[in-house]
Regions:
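Phosphate-coordinating loops and pocket residues in cytosolic domains that bind phosphorylated ligands
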Residues: 46, 86, 226, 235-236
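Short polybasic/polar patches that bind polyanions
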Residues: 21, 203, 226
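Terminal-tail/helix-coil boundary detector
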Residues: 233-244
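Conserved G/P- and acidic residue-centered "switch" motifs that form tight phosphate/ATP-binding loops
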Residues: 10, 192, 227
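GST-like fold's C-terminal all-alpha helical module
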Residues: 106-222
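Acidic-histidine catalytic/liganding microenvironments
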Residues: 214, 227-228
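Short, solvent-exposed turn/loop segments enriched in Gly/Ser/Thr/Pro and often Arg
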Residues: 7, 33, 190, 237-238
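GST-like domain detector, emphasizing the conserved glutathione-binding G-site
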Residues: 1-139, 178
Length: 244
């Protein structure tokens, strides 16, 4: 049995929901509410000491870190649903290189406009002492919250994140223009699924212009959005808007 502890709007949770949908695997839903601090409760920290989402529990055993979870699902169910890793070693290496890049570049980069556009209002409503207590309770990313400060990320960090996101969409555009319709070969893979939530979030926070001049990237995004797994991962309440 698969149980997924996740947050509706979390990009890392969306990655795993996409993979579960593509694999056709049923799962028990355990939504985590950040506003209530449910990710920092002793019960949740016993499953995931990092205090982040998602966490997959498979037959009672927790698996943490979204990309690790996605690889785990493919490893234990390679012939169930869509195959998400190539069969050859070189193909798998290409996918893993993309996964490393996604973790290091677009995933942290998209947090900057996400936090500035979506979470700053609530963060400002907290007192300095409340913010300090929250940061102290957070096992990971203390530096991230301290840089966020009380006024959001400064312009130089916003500009840097935008440059990193532009690099990401240029790499997607180049990959699908040169080799195949997909990022790492002739078939969809974890590379496509794991970068998609960052692109969706860019759209949600008004950054679609970053890739509007990239036709192959635009086509890739349209094809990804048309897959049945998209609506299963990005259901009502899981998308955000700077107007919310």
């Amino acid at each position: 049995m698969f149980e997924l502890y996740h947050a509706h709007i979390s990009t890392c949770s969306q990655k795993v929901r996409l993979c579960l949908a593509e694999k056709g695997l049923a799962w028990v839903d355990h939504p985590i509410e950040f506003a209530r601090g449910e990710h920092l409760t002793p019960a949740y920290l016993a499953l995931n000491p990092n205090g982040v989402v998602p966490t997959l529990v498979h037959d009672g055993q927790p698996v943490i870190e979204s990309s690790v979870i996605c690889e785990y699902l493919e490893e234990i169910a390679p012939d169930h649903g869509t195959a998400l890793m190539p069969r050859d070693a070189h193909g798998r290496a290409r996918v893993r290189a993309w996964l490393r890049y996604i973790e290091e570049v677009p995933t942290p980069a998209v947090r900057v406009p996400s936090f500035n556009g979506l979470f700053l209002k609530g963060w400002r409503q907290m007192s300095d002492a409340q913010r300090a207590r929250y940061i102290e309770k957070t096992p990971l990313r203390k530096g991230h919250y301290r840089r966020f400060g009380s006024d959001g990320f400064p312009k130089n960090q916003v500009d840097e994140s935008t440059e990193q996101l532009r690099q990401t969409v240029e790499r997607i555009d180049g990959a699908v223009a040169k080799d195949s319709p997909w990022l790492a070969g002739d078939a969809i893979s974890l590379a496509d699924l794991c970068v998609l939530p960052a692109i969706v979030r860019m759209s949600d926070v008004g950054l679609e212009d970053v890739w509007r001049d990239l036709p192959d990237m635009t086509d890739w995004y349209a094809r990804m959005s048309a897959r049945p797994s998209f609506t299963k991962a990005f259901y009502p309440g899981s998308r955000v808007s700077v107007a919310d």
